[in-house]
Amino acid sequence: MKTSSNLINTDIMAKVTFAGSAVTTTGELPAVGALAPKFGGVRGDLSVLHLPDLLGKRVVINFFPSLDTPVCAASVRRFNKEAAALDNTVVLCVSKDLPFAQSRFCTTEGIENVIALSVFRCKCIDEKYGITIADGPLRGLLARAVVVVDTDGRIIYEQLVDEITNEPDYVAALAALK
């Protein structure tokens, strides 16, 4: 097992790019068919929502670096639009932005059909989802990824977006719900 100076196993790091430059993540996304790893995030009102709280509903998890980037903001707007037509489905938009910033963005943009969650204090994302960027200018933020979970808590779709500045494949993610 190779390790870097911060003791992350570099044998299992995923590779993506940011503006064409290679960066790595702290691991790999869990596989389709696996139980979705538990995590919790902070809402704009500072209450905590845990993934297991949503068992019985389908869940789309939109992970992204920061709402302060055009692509991330666009992904939240798009999932908000799509979520309005989804039955028994919750869409979580997850980043390390502070909950106050997420709340301000959602209010300003009229985002009402998704739940913004901040994982600014959740270290478990690193080990359970492997999507924290390990190097480069966005080190410490989340890579762009989408995970879709069925009503039993199993992953039915996952995508780690190869280029962080690209939007996720909305069509494929939403098709997993059909």
Residue ranges and their predicted role:
Residues 2-178:
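Chalcogenol-based redox active-site neighborhoods
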